[in-house]
């Protein structure tokens, strides 16, 4: 699995901006993103494969940035169990919780988007180690200890 897209926004409800790379800071999140400095919601991550399934269910395609997630990987399932780890280059992320789709997605993508994205909206992670994340980077997934 590889990073297919990176999106950040300067503030809540402001447009998401696609970038080729971003700096992740341990304990604080992605530089330049609205959640930088938040306690646990440092990074959100989703799978394009699951977005494609949601688009098929909706009957129309949409850009991965429309979901307002930070990272989109090209394929596979995103771990949702708290404690699961993802490693992208030097950056280590820990899953905190499932990223629930917001009802506002129905406004941005279209009616039924939030329902189509249920169980496909990815995960919320905290940043454990700092480094750069680039489009094309490999993503390694590790299950939580004891699983």
Regions found by a protein language model. Give the residues of each.
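Metal-cofactor-dependent catalytic cores
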Residues: 1-147
């Amino acid at each position: 699995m590889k990073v297919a897209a990176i999106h950040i926004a300067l503030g809540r409800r402001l447009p998401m901006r696609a970038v080729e790379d971003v700096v992740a800071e341990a304990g604080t999140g992605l530089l330049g993103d609205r959640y930088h400095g938040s306690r646990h919601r440092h990074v959100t991550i989703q799978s394009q494969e699951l977005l494609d399934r949601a688009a098929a269910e909706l009957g129309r395609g949409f850009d991965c940035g429309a979901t307002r997630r930070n990272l989109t990987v090209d394929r596979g399932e995103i771990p949702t169990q708290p404690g699961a780890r993802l490693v992208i280059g030097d950056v280590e992320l820990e899953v905190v919780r499932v990223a629930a789709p917001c009802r506002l997605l129905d406004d941005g993508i279209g009616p039924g988007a939030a329902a189509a994205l249920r169980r496909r909206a990815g995960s919320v992670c905290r940043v454990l180690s700092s480094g750069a994340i680039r489009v094309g980077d490999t993503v390694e997934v590790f299950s939580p200890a004891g699983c």
